[in-house]
From Swiss-Prot:
Residues 1129-1344 form the Fibrinogen C-terminal domain. Pfam families: EGF_TEN (PF25024), EGF_Teneurin (PF23106), Fibrinogen_C (PF00147), fn3 (PF00041). Residues 37-58 are annotated as: Disordered. This is Tenascin-R. Residues 188-199, 219-230, 250-261, 281-292, 312-323 form the EGF-like domain. Brain-specific. InterPro entries: ECM_Regulatory_Proteins, EGF-like_dom, Fibrinogen-like_C, Fibrinogen_a/b/g_C_1, Fibrinogen_a/b/g_C_dom, FN3_dom, FN3_sf, Ig-like_fold. It comes from Mus musculus (Mouse). The modification Phosphoserine is found at S724. GO terms for molecular function: sphingolipid binding. Interacts with BCAN and ACAN in a calcium-dependent manner. Interacts with SCN2B, PTPRZ1, and CSPG3. Forms oligomers. Isoforms 1 and 2 form respectively trimeric (tribrachion) and dimeric kink-armed rodlike structures, which are linked by disulfide bridges. Interacts with CNTN1, TNC and FN1.
Length: 1358
């Protein structure tokens, strides 16, 4: 800023100071100074008249401040002045009444122009020119102008020459009067507290006292402070312009008061008998007037009386200090009491409009009810009370809807007579009684059983929660009178009675003893009751043959049951009968003994055996036990004999002692039980003498020898009969074993027999033929002639020879004769080592001592010899070659015969005698053949020589591999014709040693498993049968490339899924993954071989996807493996409740659409609570602000009303349809500010409209208390459909709709915010009947949701 700028500033400051001084000298009553400031921007200020203009060369437009100073004189002196003249007005115009002085200063650097205009009145009135003050002011202004002019001249001579100014300039103080000007520096040296080039900028005083901010030297104070230096406290709202602020406190003007002077002061400060409220007195009771100085009656006697010296004289029917209370009735008395009603009477004034009778049980939780009667009544009967309860009864008088104080009484109803007495079960000694429970509280029950004859009886007392009782210890068949009485304190209800007769008892302790095969003895204990007869029934278990029944007289306690079937299971039952009543039967089972076999007999006998036979038992015996021993009983023997087919069974006892008597016992055996034995004695035959032989004979005698009989005998009896027929006998002592018969006929043939005898018992005979005199061997017999042997037999000589000599030799070769010495007892001989096809001469002589008989001569020709050294060669599956050596004897040809050893025909072929081998063809493979060979000459055939041979096995055929997979292949082949025991399969791959597999011979296929994927295999195979092995067949195959395994979709969201798998065993190049959706979209991806998972992104929501994956190796691809998943976790496509929405992933509470029973045609919008106790709740009622009217008619409650996002009722029809889907649970949430409780019921259902939407709830849990169970099973009621059991219409009385009873303990559809008794939203066990709950939500959820959501059933946490 140049010197001109400083001058301008100084000038402005001087002018301002002088004007302030001028204002201070003028008194308020004389003159007034008005200052107006105008701010404008302009490019130039033109000079007009005597005004000067300053042309700025700044690039920016200057800022112009116009200051107008109006100096006014008092109105009383008729001084006037023109105000706020514009600096742009034409200053040359004549104005005789106004003297103006205009000055203008400009600052080049800041481009700020100050214009000052001072208006002084001149001719308005005589005071304008004569005022001494004004003259002094004008003089000071002129002096200031001169000082400014002088200062400018001084600056123009040195450093301030660049500054130029035009116009009317006056004196401006040096450095704004706040410093000294230095010509050396051509600048100001400011005093303390000032700064700037001309010292015009002040520092803020005291730094604003740290209570404000300094801006351009001025303090901008904090809100609590004021003053130049912010050191003064500010008064509240600046005392509302109605007082002075002194040290931050207001000193208020009249008639104001208060810390900010905003309140009006009350007259006389309400005389100390009231409170001041904004200038108005609120008087205390008993005082009135503007300043509460006047006494008055309370509430002006409420208009129901007149005031007299501050006291109210009330009209009839009213009372109280202000006559506001209605006088209560008097002399309340009880005229009658029953179990359900109380009759009351009272006295009251005639002015009463009506009476209100309030009654409530004294027990905790009792519901308070009311009844209204006209004012001219003096009594009432309260109905539908609960029996056995004590009631607090209050009677109010009502005049003009005002209730009096009550007159009260405490009255107890009588106990009700128990109802529904019935007998549940009746036995001989017990009776179970059942009756209906009471719905009210009482102490207990008393039940008595009194016999009809009044002899004795039983009395029992039971708890009140018991409604059934089982009385034991009664007499059977007795009639009892049963009484049930309710007890409470000292009171007893009238009894309910019924008669009952116990069942007659039957016989007990039934016992069956002395059971045989056909008889059983039954015993029992007789019944205690008097009966007409005893009924005994018995029959086979299972009902076969029906039952046999006997009627027995009561004294009997035993009976013999006969004609039973042996070995059978019987059931016997015994009961008692009186009139038409039959007791419960006592029964038991028993099994008859097995009957012994009958008619035991001996069929035939020998010396060592007995043939036994007997008739079978009637019982179904499986076998018979035969026990036998000699009568001496030295040793017993047992034999089990199966039951024979037919009526009898036979067995043979062997290895017995001859001639011995045996004791035999036979028992029938059935199911490890046996009958008593049937016994008999039987004797074996005597043992016969054996080996009876003739040792010598003469013309008249025959000597005999025999083997001694083994059993005990008395003697032997020898009978000998000649051919003439006259027999003779002789007795021989038992110790003899030889005897000679004498005096026989010479030359006669005798038949000799010998027997052993013991008493009258005789053994079988042994017989021999003998001759007296000499009988030579007559001829030789030849048999079994072969090529090298012959069998020779002959007859006995007589007398017997000492030895025999047999000679034989080929005919014409007597020199080769051979001799054979034979024992005299021999009757045959076999000659061996003979030559084939040779005639032999055979002679036999008997030697008797020294005498040799004439030889007996015979001849025999041996047969031709067979071929020798048979061998088999060149064996194939259907042919072989037979070789042999030629026989010695001449022959015509060979006969070769062959056939399978098992089954098959015999085939023969003739081979010339010159051939020694033969090829047999057309044989069966792997078959054992018997091959025989003999030589034939004429009709004579040699012996056959045989051998066995197996043909070779034929190979299985057409071996192929089918059904090839990565790890399996099915081998199939055609079986060979021959029998196969096993197949041998050898499986090889690459250079690995083969794996040998043995397969059963009946199979024609085999499943190869556990193969390596993508591997080339070679299979060789042959068949075996015993030692035989077929030829080998082979095939090749390659397993397929195995697919990836265990393809799984996890981490499925609404738009992505993680696909993972296990790699295949084979080496691969990559994977080909394809996924497609149900809408037809399809995408294929190539995945690296080392990857085992991929995340699919950008999927569609709520869409079913199929993922296909296969491995690839060059051009080969594996089979597909697949999996499916559904995005969005949509478990239920059409959720039928909020729980299913929650399981679908919908976790935000709000409005959702459900589909009843999952059907698209039955959709319903509901509000879902997804957070409370696990979420999934359907909210069907909400009360929260009272914006929705719940006092509605039946039709509204059926269909529902309100806003699901605010207050609403879902509708009874909808609630019924939802709960009909399954079992639901109920939760009621209630809040009062920060206090929250809930009630939970594990079952909830609302029936249909035909049942009037009855409510059904289950067991309670929670923190609110159980108030809803009182309404269990109640139909719904509205103002136009009264379905409760109360005298009044509960819905109408309590302005709601609910499942009322008589009337309610919860009224969640009541009037919002209404705290009158029972009128609001009540839950009795939480807030009682006189509090309206601000927030209520009723909600339901499927009971099974806790399980299906994967959570264990847990106890509710409070």
């Amino acid at each position: 800023m140049g010197i001109d700028g400083e001058t301008v500033v100084l000038k402005n400051m001087l002018i301002g100071v002088n004007l302030i001084l001028l204002g201070s000298m003028l008194k308020p009553s004389e003159c007034r100074l008005e200052v107006t400031t105008e701010r404008a921007q302009r490019q130039t200020v033109e000079e007009e008249g005597g005004a000067s203009s300053y042309n700025t060369s700044s690039k920016e437009q200057p800022m112009v401040f116009n200051h107008v100073y109006n100096i006014n004189v008092p109105l009383e002196s008729l001084c006037s002045s023109g105000l706020e003249a514009s600096a742009e007005q034409d200053m040359s115009a004549e104005d005789d009444t106004l003297a103006e002085y205009i000055g203008q200063t400009s600052d080049h650097e800041s481009q700020v122009t100050f214009t000052h205009k001072i208006n002084l009145p001149k001719k308005a009135c005589p005071c304008a020119s004569s005022s001494q003050v004004l003259q002094e002011l004008l003089s000071r202004i002129e002096m200031l102008e001169r000082e400014v002019s002088l200062l400018r001249d001084q600056c123009n001579t040195n450093c301030c020459q660049e500054s130029a100014a035009t116009g009317q300039l006056d004196y401006v103080p040096h450095c704004s009067g706040h410093g000294n000007f230095s010509f050396e520096s051509c600048g100001c040296i400011c005093n303390e507290g000032w700064f700037g080039k001309n010292c015009s900028e002040p520092y803020c005083p005291l730094g604003c006292s740290s209570r404000g901010v300094c801006v351009d030297g001025q303090c901008i104070c904090d809100s609590e402070y004021s003053g130049d230096d912010c050191s003064e406290l500010r008064c509240p709202t600046d005392c509302s312009s109605r007082g002075l602020c002194v040290d931050g406190e207001c000193v208020c003007e009249e008639p104001y008061t208060g810390e900010d002077c905003r309140e009006l002061r009350c007259p006389g400060d309400c005389s100390g008998k009231g409170q001041c409220a904004n200038g108005t007195c609120l008087c205390q009771e008993g005082y009135a007037g503007e300043d509460c100085s006047q006494r008055r009656c309370l509430n002006a006697c409420s208009g129901r009386g007149h005031c007299q010296e501050g006291l109210c004289i009330c009209e009839e029917g009213y009372q109280g200090p202000d006559c506001s209370a209605v006088a209560p009735p008097e002399d309340l008395r009880v005229a009658g009491i029953s179990d359900r009603s109380i009759e009351l009477e009272w006295d009251g004034p005639m002015a009463v409009t009506e009476y209100v009778i309030s009654y409530q049980p004294t027990a905790l939780g009792g519901l308070q009810l009311q009844q209204r009667v006209p004012g001219d009544w003096s009594g009432v009967t309260i109905m539908e009370l609960e029996p056995g309860l004590t009631y607090n009864i209050s009677v109010y008088a009502v005049i003009s809807n005002i209730l009096s104080l009550p007159i009260t009484a405490k009255v107890a109803t009588h106990l009700s007579t128990p109802q529904g007495l019935q007998f549940k079960t009746i036995t001989e000694t017990t009776v179970e009684v059942q009756w209906e429970p009471f719905s009210f509280s009482f102490d207990g029950w008393e039940i008595s059983f009194i016999p009809k004859n009044n002899e004795g009886g039983v009395i029992a007392q039971l708890p009140s929660d018991v409604t059934s009782f089982n009385q034991t210890g009664l007499k059977p068949g007795e009639e009892y009178i049963v009484n049930v009485v309710a007890l409470k304190e000292q009171a007893r209800s009238p009894p309910t009675s019924a008669s009952v007769s116990t069942v007659i008892d039957g016989p007990t302790q039934i016992l069956v003893r002395d059971v045989s095969d056909t008889v059983a003895f039954v015993e029992w204990t007789p019944p205690r009751a008097k009966v007409d007869f005893i009924l005994l029934k018995y029959g086979l278990v299972g009902g076969e043959g029906g039952k046999t029944t006997f009627r027995l007289q009561p004294p009997l306690s035993q009976y013999s049951v006969q004609a039973l079937r042996p070995g059978s299971r019987y059931e016997v039952s015994i009961s008692a009968v009186r009139g038409t009543n039959e007791s419960e039967a006592s029964s038991t089972q028993f099994t008859t003994e097995i009957d012994a076999p009958k008619n035991l007999r001996v069929g035939s006998r020998t010396a060592t055996s007995l043939d036994l036979e007997w008739d079978n038992s009637e019982a179904e015996a499986q076998e018979y036990k035969v026990v036998y021993s000699t009568l001496a009983g030295e040793q017993y023997h047992e034999v089990l004999v199966p039951k024979g087919i037919g009526p009898t069974t036979k067995t043979t006892l062997t290895d017995l002692v001859p001639g011995t008597e045996y004791g035999v016992g036979i028992s029938a055996v059935m199911n490890s039980k046996q009958s008593i034995p049937a016994t008999m004695n039987a004797r074996t035959e005597l043992d016969s003498p054996r080996d009876l032989m003739v040792t010598a004979s003469s013309e008249t005698s025959i000597s005999l020898i025999w083997t001694k009989a083994s059993g005990p005998i008395d003697h032997y009896r020898i009978t000998f009969t000649p051919s003439s027929g006259i027999s003779s006998e002789v007795t021989v002592p038992r110790d003899r074993t030889s005897y000679t018969l004498t005096d026989l006929e010479p030359g006669a043939e005798y038949i000799i027999s010998i027997t052993a005898e013991r008493g009258r018992q005789q053994s079988l005979e042994s017989t021999v033929d003998a001759f007296t005199g000499f009988r030579p061997i007559s001829h030789l017999h030849f048999s079994h002639v072969t090529s090298s042997s012959v069998n020779i037999t002959w007859s006995d000589p007589s007398p017997p020879a000492d030895r025999l000599i047999l000679n034989y030799s080929p005919r014409d070769k007597e020199e080769d004769m051979l001799e054979v010495l034979l024992d005299a007892t021999k009757r045959h001989a076999v000659l061996m080592g003979l030559q084939p096809a040779t005639e032999y001469i055979v002679n036999l002589v008997a030697v008797h001592g020294t005498v040799t008989s004439e030889p007996i001569v015979g001849s025999i020709t041996t047969g031709i010899d067979p071929p020798k050294n048979i061998t088999i060669s060149n064996v194939t599956k259907d042919s072989l070659t037979v070789s042999w050596s030629s026989p010695v004897a001449p022959f015509d040809y060979y006969r070769v015969s062959y056939r399978p050893t098992q089954v098959g025909r015999l085939d023969s072929s003739v081979v010339p005698n010159t051939v020694t081998e033969f090829a047999i063809t057309r044989l069966y493979p792997a078959t054992e053949y018997e091959i025989s060979l003999n030589s034939v000459r004429g009709r004579e055939e040699s012996e056959r020589i045989c051998t066995l041979v197996h043909t070779a096995m034929d190979s299985p055929m057409d071996l192929i591999a089918t059904n090839i997979t990565p790890t399996e292949a099915l081998l199939q082949w055609k079986a060979p014709m021959g029998e196969v025991e096993n197949y041998v399969i050898v499986l090889t791959h690459f250079a690995i040693a083969g794996e040998t597999i043995l397969v059963d011979g009946v199979s024609e296929e085999f499943q190869l498993v556990d193969l390596l994927p993508s591997t080339h295999y070679t299979v060789t195979m042959y068949a075996t049968s015993g030692p035989l092995m077929s030829g080998t067949i082979a095939t090749n195959f390659s397993t397929l490339l195995d697919p990836p395994d265990n393809l799984t979709a996890s981490e499925v969201t609404r738009q992505s899924a993680l696909i993972s798998w296990q790699p295949p065993r084979a080496a691969i190049e990559n994977y080909v993954l394809t996924y497609k959706s149900t809408d037809g979209s399809r995408k294929e991806l190539i995945v690296d071989a080392e990857d085992t998972w991929i995340r699919l992104e950008g999927l569609s929501e709520n869409t079913d996807y199929t993922v296909l994956l296969q491995a690839a190796q060059e051009a080969t691809r594996s089979s597909l493996t697949s999996t499916v998943f559904t995005t969005g976790g949509r478990v239920f496509s059409h959720p039928q409740d909020c729980a299913q929405h929650l399981m679908n992933g919908d976790t935000l509470s709000g409005v959702y659409t459900i589909f009843l029973n999952g059907e698209l045609s039955h959709k319903l919008q509901v509000y879902c609570d997804m957070t409370t106790d696990g979420g999934g709740w359907i909210v069907f009622q909400r009360r929260q602000n009272g914006q929705t009217d719940f006092f509605r008619k039946w039709a509204d409650y059926r269909v529902g009303f309100g806003n699901l996002e605010d207050e609403f009722w879902l509708g009874l029809d909808n609630i019924h349809r939802i709960t009909a889907q399954g079992r639901y649970e109920l939760r009621v949430d209630m809040r009062d500010g920060q206090e929250a409780v809930f009630a939970y019921y594990d079952k909830f259902a609302v029936e249909d409209s035909r049942s009037l939407y009855k409510i059904r709830i289950g067991s309670y849990n929670g923190t609110a208390g159980d108030s809803l169970s009182y309404h269990q099973g109640r139909p719904f009621s509205t103002e136009d459909r009264d379905n409760d059991v109360a005298v009044t219409n509960c819905a109408m009385s309590y302005k709601g709709a609910w499942w009322y009873k008589n009337c309610h303990r919860t009224n969640l559809n009541g009037k919002y915010g209404e705290s009158r008794h029972s009128q609001g939203i009540n839950w009795y066990h939480w807030k009682g009947h006189e509090f309206s709950i601000p927030f209520v939500e009723m909600k339901m959820r499927p009971y099974i949701h806790r399980l299906t959501a994967g959570r264990k059933r847990r106890a509710l946490k409070f």
